[in-house]
């Protein structure tokens, strides 16, 4: 499967303890996937390796056919692979538009381009009508879409 996200033989070792041993994943765009297992089974560690929080001890990770195993998290994000934490990550005292503009500050765009991109994202996420609302006043679902 060359379509989306693939991990082959992921391994992670902390000292003598191997916490992830030979995990393979193959995910297509739009799929909803869950990792199940007891505490300490390596679910979070596997996820962190895929998104780039930590480097695997072994194995490879591919996104759309391109190997990304050694890429830092921010470069993976530019390729479309991101992480949405369980905890709220929107700035509560900023508007929906201001939240997106703050994130776009890190992109090599002009002020005008950032504004256009932010407005396009608000449209894409179906929350353009909420652009001037403070993040704390959004519903849970609206806030999650903003955080995406």
Segments predicted by a language model, with ranges:
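ABC-type ATPase nucleotide-binding domains, specifically the catalytic core motifs of the NBD
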Residues: 15, 71, 98-113, 124
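The feature captures the beta-strand-to-loop junction immediately N-terminal to the Walker
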Residues: 36-38
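Helix-to-loop junction immediately C-terminal to a conserved catalytic motif
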Residues: 51
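Conserved ABC transporter NBD signature motif
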Residues: 59-67, 79, 117
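Conserved ABC ATPase "signature" region
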Residues: 66, 112-130
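Short coil-to-helix segment of the ABC ATPase nucleotide-binding domain corresponding to the Q-loop/switch region
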Residues: 93-102, 131-134
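Conserved ABC ATPase signature
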Residues: 134-138, 142
